[in-house]
Amino acid sequence: MSTARPCAGLRAAVAAGMGLSDGPAGSSRGCRLLRPPAPAPALPGARLLRLPESEAVEAASPERSGWTEALRAAVAELRAGAVVAVPTDTLYGLACSASCSAALSCVYRLKGRSEAKPLAVCLGRVADVYRYCQVRVPRELLEDLFPGPVTLVMERSEELNKDLNPFTPLVGIRIPDHAFMLDLAQMFGGPLALTSANLSSQASSLSVEEFQDLWPHLSLVIDGGPIGDSESPECRLGSTVVDLSVPGKFGIIRSGCALENTTAILQGKYGLLPSQGSCS
């Protein structure tokens, strides 16, 4: 495991930033994927591992070895209570074990983020949602939206760490449409807390180079290449966040990058009604 101290304090000027952004190279819907650039220079602190392109990863290929190495390294760091930077289907994110209270506190300190703002929970399978949430929608609805660039907010179960978002009975669930993140969540075997890899109030990150200020304070950075076109504002919107905690209704908490498709499924296929005050 890396000897980096992921919970070391940021410089005072860095720690002052406060704000909200959604956490998290793979299939990015609506954004053009670019070829990965040359590897970024390593900074003191974080270990950087470059992912092979997912299309090249086959059972006995050299690329599979690199993919497996990155998975094992990330799981080891997460189980040790560290914070790891990861690519998702929307943005680069910071992940930690949702069951490790010290790691959760570390994420807030790293980002300069108010602890009144919740972290999402990343899972690897739709079946896992039922363990951590009180689900009041058909399973088919979950399967239509997951994996994908959405965060579904539901009532949390007693299985989740009480130090995770203790101020709310709800939790946002992510199952990213990204091969590495699906493998990581399944191999880790528990809930991952996930947020965007940026200082609060700053722009979200589409490449590892865009959050280099955080590298020295992380144990591991997984470089999956650019997620989308850095010149496109749409590619920085993050996931579409939907409240499904009220039976028969949905509320759009954040429009995100998949609003049109998400609302079409919720209303057109399942007949859910927009809740009062929804930004849809």
From Swiss-Prot:
YrdC-like domain: residues covered: 68-258
Membrane-related topology note: Peripheral membrane protein
GO-annotated cellular components: cytoplasm; membrane; mitochondrion; plasma membrane
GO MF annotations, alphabetized: double-stranded RNA binding; L-threonylcarbamoyladenylate synthase; nucleotidyltransferase activity; tRNA binding
Lineage top rank: taxon: Eukaryota
PTM sites of type Phosphoserine: 61
Keywords from the named record: Cell membrane, Cytoplasm, Membrane, Mitochondrion, Phosphoprotein, Transferase, Transit peptide
Gene Ontology terms describing biological process: negative regulation of transport; regulation of translational fidelity; tRNA threonylcarbamoyladenosine modification
EC number, UniProt record: 2.7.7.87
Record field: catalytic activity: L-threonine + hydrogencarbonate + ATP = L-threonylcarbamoyladenylate + diphosphate + H2O
Annotated transit peptide: 1-56
UniProt-listed Pfam families: Sua5_yciO_yrdC (PF01300)
Top-level EC class: transferase
Localization (cell): Cytoplasm; Mitochondrion; Cell membrane
S-S bonds: none
InterPro entries per the UniProt record, alphabetical: DHBP_synth_RibB-like_a/b_dom, Sua5-like_dom, TC-AMP_synthase_SUA5
SUBUNIT field: Interacts with RSC1A1.
Domain comment as written in the entry: The mitochondrial targeting sequence (MTS) is weak and only mediates import of a small fraction of YRDC in mitochondria.
Protein family (similarity comment): Belongs to the SUA5 family.
Function, as annotated: Cytoplasmic and mitochondrial threonylcarbamoyl-AMP synthase required for the formation of a threonylcarbamoyl group on adenosine at position 37 (t(6)A37) in tRNAs that read codons beginning with adenine. Catalyzes the conversion of L-threonine, HCO(3)(-)/CO(2) and ATP to give threonylcarbamoyl-AMP (TC-AMP) as the acyladenylate intermediate, with the release of diphosphate. Participates in t(6)A37 formation in cytoplasmic and mitochondrial tRNAs. May regulate the activity of some transporters.
NCBIfam families: L-threonylcarbamoyladenylate synthase (TIGR00057)
Name under which the protein is recorded: Threonylcarbamoyl-AMP synthase
Organism: Rattus norvegicus (Rat)
Lineage: Eukaryota, Metazoa, Chordata, Craniata, Vertebrata
